[in-house]
Design a protein with these regions (language model features):
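Hydrophobic alpha-helical segments
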Residues: 1-153
């Protein structure tokens, strides 16, 4: 896989500055950082963004996330390792990431309403939208994850 463009950050600098400002706001939001990491990794898995998976798994581990929970994240529905709050966030992540298929079901929203305050509901939805923007940019430009020293067997 070859990158399609390597200087896209410079070519759309004002847009990327706004995206980085959004990330700073999300960091300061009332959402727990480990929950946001789970959301970012799960959306990135669905979108097939190796660059973002690599980044957000690394950040989650650095912030103290358990490696087993990250390994099982794609199968979260079949694991007891995720709290009801995390399960609501992950279901909402999948619903919004796959919105053309799911149409953001009312039952997923009801779980979000039950687990999160109104402020957190807004921030969670923004966090999901933000990672989907990043995924589409990185996948679209075929950004290479930095683990290039590893090779396929």
């Amino acid at each position: 896989m070859s990158p399609r463009m390597t200087d896209y950050f410079k070519r759309a600098e004002p847009a990327f500055k706004a995206m980085f400002s959004l990330e700073a706001a999300l960091t300061a939001s009332p959402l727990d950082a480990l929950l946001v990491h789970l959301v970012k990794v799960r959306a990135s898995q669905i979108n097939g963004c190796a660059y973002c998976i690599h980044m957000h798994v690394g950040e989650a581990l650095k912030d103290g996330e358990d490696p087993t929970r990250l390994h099982l994240l794609a199968g979260w529905r079949d694991s007891s390792l995720y709290s009801p709050r995390e399960r609501a966030a992950l279901a909402w992540t999948e619903a919004l990431t796959l919105v053309a298929e799911t149409h953001a079901p009312d039952e997923d929203w009801a779980a979000v309403e039950a687990a999160f305050t109104p402020d957190e509901q807004a921030w969670l939805t923004i966090a999901i939208g933000a990672i989907n923007i990043w995924n589409r940019v990185q996948v679209g430009f075929r950004a290479e994850h930095p683990a290039t020293q590893l090779h396929a067997a």
